[in-house]
Amino acid sequence: MPRKHLIASGINKKQQQQAKIWMKCAKEIKAAAKMGGPNPEANPRLKVAIERALNNNLSRDSIERNINGASKDADNLKELTYEGYGPNGLAIIVRALTDNEQRTISAVRGYFSKLQGQIAKPNSVSMLFNEYGQLLIDKKTKTLDEWFELLVDQDIVDINEDDEIIEILVQPKDFSATKLILENNNANIQSAEIKLIPTDFISLDDHARERLVRFVNACENDDDISWVITNYEEEL
């Protein structure tokens, strides 16, 4: 009996997590469609938002409803960016989509306080990041040099590899074209998104890392927060 209860509890928690992801995907689609129009081919942000939603199993019907309802439903949504610092000078950017700015800033301040960090002035932290299109593909189909030759006409910022993955960074304007070239050449794309990439990385001791993990988890569990990014050297 207790075991069944634990299984049911685990299933319910997983369903709640999935519902939260879908809600965030829907909010991003609405905001992207309102800001850049309903055509994903002419709106790179919307195209990325749709792909992320599909990767998280949000139905196409739900995606269409959110695009079509963007002009009405997104009126109350406001996009906010909070910049700040954590332990050891850790640079942090938090992006939110919210219909209640006071609620969101109050929550974000609380998260920074528990991290023993502080919110900084606008643009004081963003200078430590560059916005690039990042594409991660596995190495099974072609070598790094072969991919580089295929992408030579794109504005590639960097291309590197580890034992399993090739990472390609491009300017945002070339993101869609680069992704299409990869798809047309049978690349196994593990991840594709336009994101902020730190210009440099820092390390943390174990105690500070634990606080950072709690901070990131709190942000990810907040319905108003779309994403959080830092210049910590490890992936959490």
Curated annotation (Swiss-Prot):
Any coiled-coil regions, as ranges: none
Membrane-spanning residues: none
Keyword Cytoplasm included in the entry's annotation: yes
Subcellular location: Cytoplasm
InterPro entries in the record: Integrase-like_N, TACO1_YebC-like_2nd/3rd_dom, TACO1_YebC_N, Transcrip_reg_TACO1-like, Transcrip_reg_TACO1-like_dom3, YebC-like
SUPFAM superfamilies: YebC-like (SSF75625)
Any single Gene Ontology cellular-component annotation: cytosol
GO molecular function: DNA binding
Keywords, comma-separated and alphabetical: Cytoplasm, DNA-binding, Transcription, Transcription regulation
GO terms (BP aspect): regulation of DNA-templated transcription
HAMAP family xrefs: Transcrip_reg_TACO1
Entry-linked NCBIfam families: PRK12378.1, YebC/PmpR family DNA-binding transcriptional regulator
Family per record: Belongs to the TACO1 family.
Name recorded for this polypeptide: Probable transcriptional regulatory protein UUR10_0292
Species: Ureaplasma urealyticum serovar 10 (strain ATCC 33699 / Western)
